[in-house]
Amino acid sequence: MRIFKKRKKRIGLALSGGAVLGAAHVGVLRALQEHDISVDFVSGTSIGAFVAAFVAAGKTWEEIEEIAKRLKWLDVSGISLPQMGLLSNKKMGKLLKETLGDITFEKAQIPAAMIATDIVNGEKVILKEGDIASAVMASTCIPGIFAPVKREGHLLVDGGVLENVPITPLQDFGADMIIAVDLIAHHHIQEPDNIVEVLLNTFDFMITNASRMYTNQADILITPNLSGASRVNMDQIPELIEIGYETAKEILNAEF
């Protein structure tokens, strides 16, 4: 008589974009660890790709929190005029390399993928091979704010244009359960105070409908209420982490 051992579900974690709101992802990671939930695959779009890079490298939520709390806007951006964006995110790539080294997708501890958009043909590009730092730079290039990144023959901008909550890469990996974090589900568009916020508001209008189309494919959806938070104020990072943690803890308590 053959006895079949029940196979453990392979869990995929999808981390959405949302600029500085991405700090809430760190709180979600804390809740996952406290529930002894191990992630087998991770995907990220925009700031979600930035966090996913650290997850893929095996960093703990405490290590990622320490990095997030130290971040300043000037650490991840620099003036790039007269190029195709107000700012460059080359500093972000440098920060990743300084923290993680020259890590590639192939050498990551956890299989990972990031989503970007080809600004020439409008197609979604799933990045899961080669250098992780350049993939994150491409996925975080909010159109008009950051200059596009050239990679593998593509001119790439933020993946949130087409799939802000990156579900499809996890399906491609073969995840049995997908936990998705949508940072903008409750976010209210506010009157902008500067050109960056004008562009972010425009970007938000573009990605809202696309997000809804994909989030209904998640098995567990975590939507922190960040309606009163700014997408550019880094002083609120500790509060965002706590909101992400409390929201995820409540949902995971009900599911596991």
Regions found by a protein language model. Give the residues of each.
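Patatin-like phospholipase
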Residues: 1-45, 50-256
